[in-house]
UniProtKB/Swiss-Prot annotation:
One cellular component (GO) term of this entry: cytoplasm
Binding site for a divalent metal cation 2: 65, 222, 225
Protein's name in the database: GTP cyclohydrolase 1 type 2 homolog
Binding site residues for a divalent metal cation 1: 102, 225
Keywords: Metal-binding
Family to which the UniProt record says this protein belongs: Belongs to the GTP cyclohydrolase I type 2/NIF3 family.
SUPFAM superfamilies the record matches: NIF3 (NGG1p interacting factor 3)-like
Length: 262
């Protein structure tokens, strides 16, 4: 089947025009007018995922994080450029779905809400009329540490960072969440009355500002977005069965998380 058939179905669910302004999105390498037999879904494109794609004879990669985010001045061989050159050598097309999958109803942030049992969720920060990034909703009243422990368990993490002073452990029930690096949206969480904000990559001074505003936070890191790979595989597999597509769909098993904790 042609790659375009699969991507057209995906974009009907998750349109590119939902993406935030300036985002890198859509086809980034190769062609959609090619026959594909195997598709791989990954969070990132790094040397490990490219090697995995080559080994599995993948024709199309769907990734959340674009391998090319800033304009390139050359494609001269180097450790970073070789990731791209290997994709070109093996004729592997690359399609990027970044903030549109964060924003779309039934997408990544809603998958997070399902896992954490966040109910009555609406968008956190409006990006265009009727749509927004992040989610805010409610959970049964519980202690902050209980929620943090659930986040660790659900996402199979060794640790999370708790943003609080003096080991405070208040009861909380209104939760904001944004996958990836969502510190810039913390004021939306404050304005909408969240008790706690779950997001990754929170800066030191941003954490202090949150606490001054009365907002606690749980930082599970950026890599919880790896949920994208399995959930999108499930969705594509369903479309494959409905439409009789002759294509194999796999999710990457290579870890691209650069962090570990001693």
């Amino acid at each position: 089947m042609k790659a375009k058939i699969l991507i057209d179905a995906y974009e009907a669910f998750c349109p590119l025009d939902l993406s935030m302004e300036g985002d890198v999105k859509g086809l980034q390498m190769g062609s959609l007018d090619k026959d594909i037999r195997k598709v791989m879904i990954t969070l990132d494109i790094r040397e490990s995922t490219v090697a995995e794609a080559i080994k599995n004879e993948v024709d199309l990669i769907i990734t959340k994080h674009a391998p090319i985010f800033k304009p390139l001045k050359d494609l001269v061989s180097s450790p970073q450029r070789d990731i791209l050159l290997d994709l070109v050598k093996h004729d592997i097309s690359v399609y990027v779905s970044h903030t549109n999958i964060d924003i779309v109803p039934g997408g990544l942030n809603d998958w997070f809400c399902d896992l954490l049992e966040i109910k009555e969720a609406t968008y956190l920060s409006e990006t265009k009329e009727g749509f927004g990034i992040g989610r805010i909703g409610t959970v049964k009243e519980q202690a902050l540490e209980e929620l943090a422990s659930k986040v660790k368990r659900v996402f199979d993490l060794d640790t999370v960072r708790l943003i609080r002073y003096d080991k405070e452990n208040p009861l909380i029930s209104k939760i904001a969440i944004c996958g990836g690096s969502g510190g810039e949206f913390y004021q939306d969480a404050v304005q909408k009355g969240a008790d706690v904000y779950i997001t990754g990559d929170i800066y030191y001074h941003t954490a202090q500002e949150m606490l001054t505003e009365g907002l606690f936070a749980v930082d599970p890191g950026h890599h919880i977005e790896v949920l994208f790979t399995e959930k999108l595989k499930e969705k594509l597999q369903g479309w494959k069965e409905e439409n009789g597509w002759d294509v194999s769909i796999i999710s990457s098993k290579a870890s691209t998380n650069p962090f570990s904790h001693l």
